[in-house]
């Protein structure tokens, strides 16, 4: 079985979630609500957690957000990260209000005296700080001297880290996000060679669900396959639940996340012998809320169908009005095409019950 080998980094705790070390890649997202609307923000956090998100970041943009931050933390089912830009006082307020981690941007928080206050408080509370560099908000002097490059991003990170370390703080997570996929890959590879701190990876402002998924998969897939990355956010325009779904599928495709039903199906070429598309859609819908490891193959011709179906936990190879159903590598029955969906659902439900029962026993 193919397996992605992970690079080992220092480990840090974000609340009760550990990032780095020998731990799995942690999935995170960011709310799209106004933070001062506590009810809506907490509701969205809970939705994200139900989908499989482990850490949630929320924006602290103004006094209202800062005042509401503690209420969000109190009512959240997961650790909350404060996203801070421009005003260092909001970082202090967020830490005092129970932030499990703070994200700071070297491009817009530069006052060393204020940074030392943040560092001291984070040390007392034993919470990590993410040094979050972004290609779109690099310090002006680096823009002039280096342009928007991986070297400029690395210098910005090093400045912050040097300040933090000189003040006795090493509870650090690092990110170097860029909208350009190749730039992000280069920056993260440099960081992986330079630092032993855990890396938060992402392609910033990646775009819509379609475009952003492609860009993120291209960039983050390369990094993850090379063992780089300890926590991940896929930035998409729109519903943050989509970010979590794409994260899970990307990690699953690299063998880094198994709590997912993996459905494989034909590309519906000219060899297809039955109406496959509605079957795939129905089974995807049926398994959407089932978070457990299962491989389901839905195939429609005699060329690859039987072989692929045998490799799955459950599979069908259909054609000419009937389908052969496979379970655990063996053909178990042949059923009419109009009964395929119901038969698949029954078998999947049995597997899901077995999984849930096994979890209860533990």
UniProtKB/Swiss-Prot annotation:
InterPro entries attached to this UniProt entry: Dihydropteroate_synth-like_sf, IspG_bac, IspG_bac-typ, NO2/SO3_Rdtase_4Fe4S_sf
Protein name: 4-hydroxy-3-methylbut-2-en-1-yl diphosphate synthase (flavodoxin)
Organism: Malacoplasma penetrans (strain HF-2)
HAMAP family named among the record's database cross-references: IspG (MF_00159)
Gene Ontology terms for molecular function: 4 iron, 4 sulfur cluster binding; 4-hydroxy-3-methylbut-2-en-1-yl diphosphate synthase activity (ferredoxin); 4-hydroxy-3-methylbut-2-enyl-diphosphate synthase activity (flavodoxin); iron ion binding
Disulfide bonds: none
PANTHER family per the UniProt record, alphabetical: 4-HYDROXY-3-METHYLBUT-2-EN-1-YL DIPHOSPHATE SYNTHASE, 4-HYDROXY-3-METHYLBUT-2-EN-1-YL DIPHOSPHATE SYNTHASE (FERREDOXIN), CHLOROPLASTIC
Taxonomic lineage: Bacteria, Bacillati, Mycoplasmatota, Mycoplasmoidales, Mycoplasmoidaceae
UniProt cofactor note: Binds 1 [4Fe-4S] cluster.
Keywords annotated in UniProt: 4Fe-4S, Iron, Iron-sulfur, Isoprene biosynthesis, Metal-binding, Oxidoreductase
NCBIfam families cross-referenced by the UniProt entry: ispG_gcpE, PRK00366.1
Family: Belongs to the IspG family.
Binding site for [4Fe-4S] cluster: 266, 269, 301, 308
GO biological process: isopentenyl diphosphate biosynthetic process, methylerythritol 4-phosphate pathway; terpenoid biosynthetic process
EC number(s) stated in the UniProt entry for this protein: 1.17.7.3
Catalytic reaction annotation: (2E)-4-hydroxy-3-methylbut-2-enyl diphosphate + oxidized [flavodoxin] + H2O + 2 H(+) = 2-C-methyl-D-erythritol 2,4-cyclic diphosphate + reduced [flavodoxin]
Gene behind the chain: ispG
Entry superkingdom: Bacteria
